[in-house]
C-alpha cells in the first residue's frame, strides 16, 4: 500500500503548542499507538511462537499491515501559532502570526525537514526549524524556535513587569532548542534582553 502526493497546502492553519513544567509537549498526546497496531503486533508474536521460522513470520506480518506514504511538499500559508513554554526559568508565551513555510519530502521511510517564518507583535520576527520522523515523532524530533526583536509588551509573562518593576520598553531575543530521542526531551535556550527600561516599582 502506497500513497504519493505532490503538494498539500494548508491555508490559515492554527496550532497551539505548549510545553508544561514537566517538559511534556501537549502535541505528544496526539501520538499514540492505535489498537489495530497493537493487535497486529500481538498477532505477529503469536504467529512467530508457533512457527518454525519466527523471524520470517514476523517480517511477513509487518509487510502485510504496513502503509507507506510520500508527500513532496506541505505548504503553510498565513498560519497562526500560540506557543508557550512553562519549563523556562521565566515562563514564556506568545503568538506567532502570518506564518509561512514548507515541510519538504514527507516520507514514511526517512526524516522530514521544514522551515517556517512568522511575525510576533508589531515588529518581532520568528523562525522555526523542524526535523522529524513523520511516522514516529517520539523516536526522533528536533525543533528550533528563534525569536528576534520581540517587544516585551507582546509576550507574557514578561509584559507588564519585571523583578517587581513596570516595564516601559525593551526587546527580547530568544532561541529555544528541543530534541526528542526515544520519547526523552532535551532542551537548551539562550535569552537576551536588550534596551530594557524599567519604570516605577509595583
Describe the predicted segments one by one.
Residues 122:
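An active-site-proximal beta-strand-loop segment
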